[in-house]
UniProtKB/Swiss-Prot annotation:
Record-stated family: Belongs to the queuine tRNA-ribosyltransferase family.
Cross-referenced Gene3D superfamilies: Queuine tRNA-ribosyltransferase-like
Protein's recorded name: Queuine tRNA-ribosyltransferase
Binding partners and assembly: Homodimer. Within each dimer, one monomer is responsible for RNA recognition and catalysis, while the other monomer binds to the replacement base PreQ1.
Amino acid sequence: MEFKLKHKDGMARVCEITTAHSTFLTPVFMPVGTVGAVKSLDANDMKNELDAKIILANTYHMYLRPTSKVVKDFGGLHGFTKFDRSFLTDSGGFQAFSLSKNSKHFNEGIEFKSHIDGSRHLFTPKSVLDTQYDFHSDIMMILDDLVALPATKERVKISVDRTILWAKEAITYHKSMQNKGIGIGQNIFGIIQGGTDYEERKRCALSLNEMPFDGLAIGGLSVGEENALMYETVQNLNPYLDENRPRYLMGVGTPEDLVENVERGVDMFDCVMPTRNARNGTFFTSFGKFNIKKAEFINDHEAIGPACSCYTCRNFSRGYLNHLFKAKELTFFRLASLHNLHYYLELAREMREAILNNSFTQFKKNFYHLRGK
């Protein structure tokens, strides 16, 4: 992976990242394709309608079904999905933690029950990389020990100890596999844990900074803490993060979260929010969000965002979308998802432009002004 820090405006950064499959600028939002597809959309939508340069797929879900061996047989995720740009795959640790009621965390890894058939499985630092080697993802995430917040200081310390232990095991294993010709062209990111504990976050960040990861992620946030505490945690981490590696805030978030964390030096984001909210009838616009099911939209001839250039806004009215949603027409999911993802990707583009023009502070003021804040 090639990484170039192009420009800074305060802590906000524009960086250029090149993988084996695409080059993209940050800040970047990565649409989430949990099971190898962004819900209701296909590779053509992602490339030609949205021009997404990188998307995320989920190791936990695709390990269980269809299995990594099936994906490998199709030539990895790129051959399987026909999306020929970059893929980032998470380690599956979050899903093992959140979807399995009886998951158990040991120093060896995470034991969990499949949410599909109840079968038992063990994720280890090595096994999750083996799975991602089969996926041939461009960016692989290591296994980390996630804790729900609030958590005791003792549990947070255990989480950081395990995450550092697993990071050492993962980076050593990855280098040994590359020496065998496996994982060539695949990049590996470490994950910083520590809850909202300043000293534990610092300890984890400093430890992972010493390891030759291609990038660093901030995990374990947006899991129950207040937004202000998340922003404070990210800002406090900034001095301890290598400036010459990408910074990825996992699973975040709202448009406001993106703006606030870009201001604090974050480069990469992913979240299911734009597509999940789309399926529930909620649209994101520059003026805030609204739900299309309201009666006021029945005879509304305007587009969702009058100035929006997405496929949905170029072609269809709020009145039509109100009808599709109430009729439970499946077409609605695609049209709504296209709009919301376009909004998120356009927000990232606008932030890049503002940073390059040294006007991010003014951009942020305008962002909140349009929302009446």
